[in-house]
């Protein structure tokens, strides 16, 4: 059966295929995290990163798509990385939205908490470069899976807001090992103080951009990249979460929880979907 995604929604929920996808993505991550945590067994230098890429959410998406839809489905999933019809303004939104929110949160931190608090780190350039490269890698290894494969199928069954929350919980579980495995970039950080609120609020932005670009994955990879290159901005964590919460509420209020797409834009998207389906 042809269940390829058209636009930002799939043609069917595909519960079994979704379960297979999450089993690969979450199971492999758990195994990898445990191997690193217990330092067992001894492995070649490149074994861990290669294993992580192959069985990442993106890797799992291509595996399941290849098994269920063949080469045609794999090519269709890959082509979602670039859509010539994507509006350039959404690429800018993807790159700059979180940076603007972080700057705003940094300024609020100075005003409300400590006027002497420095807004920028001293080594800003190196922080931006490292953050951008790490975020780009993470985006490429995750977004074909979370948004390219799972989100369109979730939106067949639930509205955009509910789909965002459900996917946020699952993808959040996938990230837990980054807080407990030695050598991971977030090892030792306080998971409960930061990640759940940050992730669940931020994930509304992912779905909002995904749906308004008709399922474009380049925009999502850029947005994922932007989550990492703003580390040179000093801010209070809870102030930033508050700023993101307000932004998420505004997005839902203006665009609506059903599709996170304004009605006029949604009609245009539906016409594009019908044209692609014909």
Give the role of each language-model region.
Residues 180-189:
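Interfacial helix-loop-helix junctions of multi-pass membrane proteins
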């Amino acid at each position: 059966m042809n269940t390829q995604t058209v636009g930002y929604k799939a043609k069917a929920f595909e519960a079994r295929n979704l379960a297979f996808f999450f089993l690969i993505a979450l199971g492999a991550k758990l195994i990898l995290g445990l191997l690193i945590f217990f330092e067992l067994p001894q492995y070649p230098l490149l074994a861990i990163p290669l294993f992580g890429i192959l069985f990442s959410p993106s890797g799992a998406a291509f595996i399941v798509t290849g098994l269920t839809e063949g080469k045609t489905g794999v090519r269709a999933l890959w082509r979602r990385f670039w859509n010539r019809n994507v509006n350039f303004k959404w690429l800018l939104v993807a790159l700059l939205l979180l940076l603007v929110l972080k700057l705003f949160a940094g300024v609020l931190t100075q005003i409300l908490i400590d006027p002497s608090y420095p807004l920028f780190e001293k080594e800003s350039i190196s922080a931006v470069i490292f953050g951008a490269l790490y975020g780009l890698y993470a985006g490429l290894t995750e977004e074909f899976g979370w948004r390219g494969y799972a989100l369109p199928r979730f939106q067949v069954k639930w509205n955009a807001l509910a789909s965002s929350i459900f996917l946020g919980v699952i993808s959040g579980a996938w990230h837990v090992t980054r807080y407990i495995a030695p050598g991971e970039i977030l090892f030792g950080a306080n998971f409960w103080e930061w990640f759940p609120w940050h992730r669940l609020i931020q994930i509304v932005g992912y779905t909002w951009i995904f749906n308004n670009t008709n399922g474009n994955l380049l925009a999502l990879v850029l947005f994922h990249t932007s989550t990492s290159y703003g580390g040179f901005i000093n801010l209070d964590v809870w102030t930033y979460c508050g700023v993101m919460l307000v932004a998420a509420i505004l997005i839902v209020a203006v665009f609506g929880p059903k599709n996170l797409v304004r009605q006029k834009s949604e009609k245009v998207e539906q016409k594009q979907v019908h044209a692609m389906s014909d």
